[in-house]
């Protein structure tokens, strides 16, 4: 029996030693800068109460489509638990299209909202699991939203546009998986909210990306 235990201990020890020697399984650096890029799916949660009120009686509602976008970030890890992150998120093409008839007159319309956000966030990693690093993120910054709308009836059309810039906030959670000690793939979910002139702009995001840690 003692010999069996010794044999299993030797085998397990050899496996652990082999895993530690694989470069791709080396633990990530505890501190230093990193740069990442990813693709984002954004699900709108716009506050369309005023627009819905204007559409009252038409049987229509302002139901904007979701969209896809791009996220670019640069950060610095102070230690294995805390990092600061600057990010640029570009989410074009939240669209609303409608085709109906009002009083027997055909009417069509479309509206598009494009969102760009620059944020500074605190990234907290409560568990040090070497390759797998779950985290919480909370931050704020500046959001810019541009809206274009067009309404058409036979023989006539009208268009309008608007641009607003104001503060915003985000909160979320995610996980980074270190493929090597330098390269990580990540998945993050977050909720965003604009404030003041952009209080109607709210949405959820899911971002998948890759980052290089120097």
Task: Locate predicted features.
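Gram-negative (and chloroplast) outer-membrane scaffold detector with strong preference
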Residues: 29-32, 36-45, 68, 72-153, ...
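Short, conserved structural micro-motifs that define repeat-unit consensus positions
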Residues: 71-77, 172-174, 184-186
């Amino acid at each position: 029996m003692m010999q069996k235990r010794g044999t299993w201990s030797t085998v397990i020890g050899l496996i652990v030693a082999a895993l530690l020697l694989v470069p791709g399984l080396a633990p990530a650096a505890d501190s230093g800068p990193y740069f990442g890029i990813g693709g984002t799916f954004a699900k709108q949660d716009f506050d369309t109460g005023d627009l819905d009120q204007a559409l009252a009686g038409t049987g229509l509602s302002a139901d904007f489509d979701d969209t896809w976008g791009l996220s670019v970030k640069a950060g610095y890890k102070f230690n294995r638990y805390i990092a600061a992150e600057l990010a640029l998120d570009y989410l074009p093409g939240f669209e609303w299209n409608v085709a109906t008839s009002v009083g027997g007159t055909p009417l069509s319309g479309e509206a598009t909202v494009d969102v760009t956000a620059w944020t500074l966030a605190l990234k907290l990693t409560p568990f040090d699991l070497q390759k797998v690093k779950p985290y919480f993120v909370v931050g704020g910054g500046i959001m810019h939203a541009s809206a274009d709308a067009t309404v058409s009836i036979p023989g006539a059309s009208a268009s309008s546009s608007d641009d607003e810039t104001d503060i915003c906030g985000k909160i979320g959670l995610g996980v980074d998986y270190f493929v090597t000690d330098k390269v990580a793939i990540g998945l993050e979910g977050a909720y965003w909210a604009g404030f003041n002139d952009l209080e109607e702009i709210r949405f959820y995001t899911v971002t998948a990306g890759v980052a290089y840690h120097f």
